[in-house]
Amino acid sequence: MTFELAAEHEQFRRTVRDFAEKEVAPHAAQWDRDHYFPVEVVARMGELGLFGLTAPEEYGGAGLSGEDGGFTSLCLAIEELGRIDQSIGITLEAAVGLGINPILTFGTEEQKQQWLPDLVAGRTLAGFGLTEPGAGSDAGATKTRAELSNDEWVINGSKQFITNSGSSLTSVVAVTARTGAVTDSQGNERAEISALLVPAGTPGFTAEKAYDKLGWHASDTHPLSFEDVHVPAASLLG
């Protein structure tokens, strides 16, 4: 077993390192001071194909083959960006791991066609709304609720610390919510937790003022609120 990177991975690492040192490093300190989310750098990352490393070609991704399906390249990109500015590293990590991959893994073909091409190209970003005040990231403790009424889900609740959820690039947030109850194999009833795709700009969906965090000031992180937010029944993810 060898732990050395393949030649193509080393080449890719050098490409991302060069980008980070030339286009991120000169501005990182100022972005952090200004609490500025650099949408222009996200666009450049999209041009480099960084958001599509694990996505199939049919949605605009790299379609990388092999055992890792592009995840080694993704990890190298996150590492090199984070070496210069962790805000930019987490932007990529969350955009793919929390934004693209849930839709790619669990979405219907219609959902994939609607959202993935722009997400994979870096033209837009998606968030994943799990964490809540008082519940943390414990999905089973989710308090946000969604009720199905006349072929629409009506969502009420709040989320906190949601990355890539409130910039001009945000197109959609997958929101976890209680959608009913299920009975487990032991006969015990528990909450049914589902994820719903909520487009940015949907009435009642508000990305509140970005957090003044201890660090990562150039990462886009917001509390979210949902007040009688209506989305189609087909917005259910998975």
Ranges and model annotations:
Residues 1-91, 113-114, 118-121:
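Amphipathic, small/basic residue-rich leader segments at the start of a protein or domain
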Residues 156-206:
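A short core secondary-structure module
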Residues 49, 78-82, 177, 198-203, ...:
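Short Ser/Thr-interspersed hydrophobic loop/turn segments at strand-loop and sheet-helix junctions
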Residues 83, 135-137, 160-167, 216:
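Glycine-rich phosphate/pyrophosphate-binding beta-alpha loops
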Residues 89-110, 136-139:
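N-terminal glycine-rich flavin-associated loop
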Residues 144-147:
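A structural signal for short hydrophobic beta-strand segments in well-ordered beta-sheet cores
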Residues 122-130:
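A short, Trp-centered hydrophobic/proline-enriched beta-strand micro-motif
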Residues 68-71, 200-210, 220-238:
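A glycine-rich, basic-preceded beta-loop-alpha segment at the flavin cofactor/substrate interface
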